[in-house]
Amino acid sequence: MEPQLLFEGNSPEFDFLGAVKAGFPSPAESIREHLDLSSLLVRHKASTFFFRVDGVSMVEADMDEGDILIVDRALEPYNGCRAVCFLDGEFTVKTVEISENGALLRPANPAYKPIPVGPENNFSVWGVVTWVIKKCTP
């Protein structure tokens, strides 16, 4: 058997991604950049607020009891947004559906009914939910 060239002409170039540990990895060695949670999670500092979820009406929207909601009051509410609303003296978080007849506050749990909102209600969309912070361990 005669030896053959593996590649004819120029050999191809491959990306070199860096070293890979064969022992215990050091998390600090793979840091490429630092993450500032404040700049990631808060667009409008003066109009951003935090709420803790109390209840289970939004569980199918991944808003579970005890989660922290980041709510931005500077954002314009839109049809289908998840928002903290002020309804007849109380705060609630729901999906907001806007129509010519008013609004419908839709829960994300089939055990709860949608809440129709009309001119007789004291109602406002207080702020749009931009992030949900979850705790993954007990």
Residue ranges and their predicted role:
Residues 71-72, 86, 132:
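Residue-level recognition of conserved beta-strand edge/terminus positions
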Residues 66-67, 81:
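Structural motif
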Residues 49, 79-93, 97-103:
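Short, compositionally biased
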Residues 1-59, 90-91, 98, 131-138:
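Short, positionally conserved secondary-structure boundary motifs
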Residues 42, 74-76:
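Short polar/acidic secondary-structure junctions
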